[in-house]
Structure formats: C-alpha cells, structure tokens
Amino acid sequence: LTLGLDTVLGGQSLSPYYTMSKSDYHTDADSVSIGMGVGGFFTVGERHSFSYGYSYSDSKGNHNSSDDTARETNSIGHGYTFNHDYIFTEIISTSIGLGYSDSDAIVDAGNDYETYDFSLGVNLSFPWAYIAISNGMSFNDYKKEDSSVASDRLRSDFTNTFDIMLTKAIGDILPAIDQNRNLFINLSYENGISEATTFNYDSHSDSFSLSFTKSF
C-alpha cells in the first residue's frame, strides 16, 4: 500500500508519503514494514535548485516454529538527504548530494549501523548527445561487533560507485527511421567497489546496459 500527496507550500514543492507492506510466508516468519516521509524541492534564482527529504521506517518479523530469530532484526530507521543542483551554462550543470541514515535493531550485533553518503555529478547537454557522469561514496559504520563474523573487529564498509550514461537521438545516426528525433538510445556503464574491515564483504562489480526510449 502506498499513499502520496504532491503539493506546494510557501514556494516549495512538498511530497509526503506513507507505505505499508506485509509478507505472509508459508514456511518462514511473517514480516511487516511501515514507512513514511516527506520530500521537498525549491529553487533560488535561475541557476540553483535544492531538494531534501526525510524518511522513517519500521520493519518487524514475527517468530514462528520455522524461524525463531526473525524478531532479532526488527529495526527502526531514519534517513535524511540534501541535494543541490547548479546550472553553469546551457550545456554544463552539476549536482551534489549528501545523505545520512541510522538503523537500530533489537539485536545490535551485525544489524545496527549508520550510513553517510556523498555524491557528485556532472551533466553535459551537448547538441549531439546528453552525457551524465556521477560518482557516489557511501560509508557504513556498525555499532557493535558481530561475533558470527569477527568478534574482535568492528565492521566498517566503504562503497564507491562510478557511472556514466550517454543518451543520443537515433535520428542523428539514422535520420530515415527517426525523422522527428524522438527515439533515443541509452548506453550506461557502472563500476562498484566495496571494501570492508571484514573481508567477507569486499566486492567489485561492473555492469553495462543498453535501452531505447521514445517520446510522443
């Protein structure tokens, strides 16, 4: 279930929302998740725009005969975001994002953590193509040692994600099949590196995607 509202108040766009989901498993503990929050957006002059958000989550799992530890990961979460976009020229714009979230579970070990996010992006609106380049960093700091992994080491994770996307009108390449230039090809590449103080969580990934979109 999702309920949302978009409105304008005091020159700002506001979007409060509420979500609820429930999973009934035949052979595992049932789970219920409730979330709510609000997002806001406003501009300053013609070049600056700001967005922000707050989110709250409450996740619960019930004990049953098949899973008598589900309740241990019941958690309350709070999240905050703030973003700034700036238009340098008709071609170049930038975006900076900050985020913080906190999760508190019944059993602290391996479940309680704080997350700090930072991202930087550059958008290039060339006449011949649109290119978006961004890099995001995320730091996870756990609050208590997880004895099932390393009882003498407090886990801390660092994740760096770099991606680049190119969008181009098919009509620039094959005008015969896209005379109105409203069919686009999208190419993207993403590189993700995750490092942790416990090597069990180290990873490195690369992904590529190709898609087509059409506007009417």
Regions found by a protein language model. Give the residues of each.
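Gram-negative and organellar
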Residues: L1-F216
